[in-house]
Amino acid sequence: MSLLAEDTAAADLGLRWKPGFRALGPAFLTELRPTPLPDPPYWVGHSEAAARLLGLPADWRQSEGTLAALTGNLPVAGTLPFATVYSGHQFGVWAGQLGDGRAIMLGETEGGLEVQLKGAGRTPYSRGADGRAVLRSSIREFLCSEAMHGLGIPTTRALCVTGSDARVYREMPETAAVVTRVAPSFIRFGHFEHFSASQRDAELRALADYVIDRYYPDCRSTSRFNGNAYAAFLEAVSERTAALLAQWQAVGFCHGVMNTDNMSILGLTIDYGPFQFLDGFDPRHICNHSDTSGRYAFNQQPNVAYWNLFCLAQALLPLIGDQEIAVAALESYKTVFPREFESRMRAKLGLAEPAEGDRALIEGVLKLMAAEKVDYTIFWRRLSQHMAGGNAEPVRDLFLDRAGFDAWLLSFSERHAQLPRAQAADLMLRSNPKYVLRNHLGQQAIEAASQKDFSAVATLLALLETPFEEHPGADAYAGFPPDWASTIEISCSS
């Protein structure tokens, strides 16, 4: 029986749909419908920017049918929902079959965007779990998805969060919520690992061909690797991943759970769980309370990404056909990451063009910051404001080692001596955000939302969508975290 939502009870979102990933067939997915929540849903937060990206009509939230549909309580006209199967390595250990345990794909729009409901109920891949998401984790994912987009970092998007008074149980009873996620593709490294590990080469090839033809068509005409399109594909994914990690490290973003099933094949930030933007700069910071070994510590992220790419290379080996070629396809990561990272850090310093000594300038200030765990975001913003004509004292006040910082600041000033200061200041203010989604800000929004006050979610979203702007009157959102912020524990259930 077809699950295609043609019945009169279906909600029409005003979107046209096409087969997309579903055309790969039943080996890759299971058709199913979301499980309705027992309590009436309500809007928690929404992104008009994501709505415009999808091409939704201006009044898209006015229909009760839309609210019900984006909570999983009503079918969406023209869709055939499904969940996908994948496998992966979790904390460095092969975990076997995983899959979309609480995410159900509505489908792909004619504009080429997949729409997914996260928290919409059990799937065949839920592994005994309830398939639900809780309000706190849903708000965090919604806000961070849009915050990363505001920062210019590749990411899945979030259209909205809907809530319900239905109870779900984690460490404590909580209320259920659903995030509507949007991306060109939600395909992960783990999708390839699944078919490779089970030696299903035909399905592995079909998946790789689908991804190459849809998202990496230039790999078909490459002269690299003797025209091996699969090796060229691996190299392209490596380069996108390297560029993504450079942006994470430059902005101070700690993902927290970089398992291979949480790695996007398109180089997007995906699966916002126990993430954190650094407060004090600690290269060894571990944001995930569940990560007792520190595998996913902030300074380990670039190495972990390369390890994950090596797992992808192993998965693609039946298609690439030569281990040496597969290893060679990974080499670009080692050049792209440092190049992109230094480029991002130079921009934070207001340096549009590279020069000898820039690396020492970057490493020098990071060392000073790490020694005293100086607030990462505030330091860079204050340095930008100093370059824009402000006093140096607000920057100096961040350091106890004034002599050490003054020596660095002198080197910084000498580097800029022959450069246009206004242009440098403009570059810095465009590269160093004033607002990031700090844990305590998210927590305050979550606590308010749990009392049905969603204004804090909307206020935060407005700031995070344009984080480089000053936003007069919002300085409280750009200040130092309160002492209690250090007691917030986030884990894989977050």
From Swiss-Prot:
Keywords: ATP-binding, Magnesium, Manganese, Metal-binding, Nucleotide-binding, Nucleotidyltransferase, Transferase. Its cofactor is Mg(2+); Mn(2+). InterPro entries: SelO. It catalyses: L-seryl-[protein] + ATP = 3-O-(5'-adenylyl)-L-seryl-[protein] + diphosphate; L-threonyl-[protein] + ATP = 3-O-(5'-adenylyl)-L-threonyl-[protein] + diphosphate; L-tyrosyl-[protein] + ATP = O-(5'-adenylyl)-L-tyrosyl-[protein] + diphosphate; L-histidyl-[protein] + UTP = N(tele)-(5'-uridylyl)-L-histidyl-[protein] + diphosphate. Its EC number is 2.7.7.-, 2.7.7.108. ATP binds at residues 99, 101-102, 118, 130-131, 181, 188, 271. It comes from the Bacteria. Mg(2+) binds at residues 262, 271. Pfam families: SelO. One of its GO terms (molecular function) is ATP binding. The active site is at residue 261. Nucleotidyltransferase involved in the post-translational modification of proteins. It can catalyze the addition of adenosine monophosphate (AMP) or uridine monophosphate (UMP) to a protein, resulting in modifications known as AMPylation and UMPylation. Belongs to the SELO family. This is Protein nucleotidyltransferase YdiU. It comes from Variovorax paradoxus (strain S110). The gene is ydiU.
